[in-house]
Amino acid sequence: MACRIIEQYRHLKIFGIKITPHFHDVTEGLVTILEESGFSVYEETNRETSKDTSRMLRAGAIKVYFAKVTDTTLEEAFFEILEHIPSKAPIICESPALRNYIEPGLFIIMDSPGINKDKDICHLQKLPHVVFNMDNIGMIQPLPVTFQNNKWTCNK
């Protein structure tokens, strides 16, 4: 979904962000911005991998940032990334846990009835959000998402 929105609005010069609690090895193309105790922030420069950050670049994001965080450093890492993004720039951020700290312009939950869900997102579903179904999202052209007045909205 993130890549679909980026591709649809690539002319807006969107910045992508991916935040994960998984501390995988650094891959080729990740340029270190900051490494602190509990989190690391990188800029993705490799468009050729199957990682979400590379896919965001291929979809048309002007820059993509990647952070590895713990629960206690997530917010700090996010604000570090924002230091590298112009104010009022459109941002697509993939991080369900960030929703516990930040009120986004639009929070999208992807639903797929046929897939076993490993993550418990009941607490996120109680917050304002929009749900898209993964089984039929490919048929929706264009996506009912817009960026107006420096804010993402959905006219679903």
Predicted segments with their positions:
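Short secondary-structure boundary/capping elements
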Residues: R47-E48, T73, P90, N116
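N-terminal phosphate/diphosphate-binding loop that engages ATP/GTP or pyrophosphate donors
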Residues: C3-V69
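Short, well-ordered secondary-structure micro-motifs
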Residues: T27-L30, A77, E103
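Conserved catalytic-core segment of NTP-binding enzymes
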Residues: E83-P90, S95-K156
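Short, ordered loop/turn segments at secondary-structure junctions
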Residues: I19-H22, V69-T70, P96-A97, D135-I137
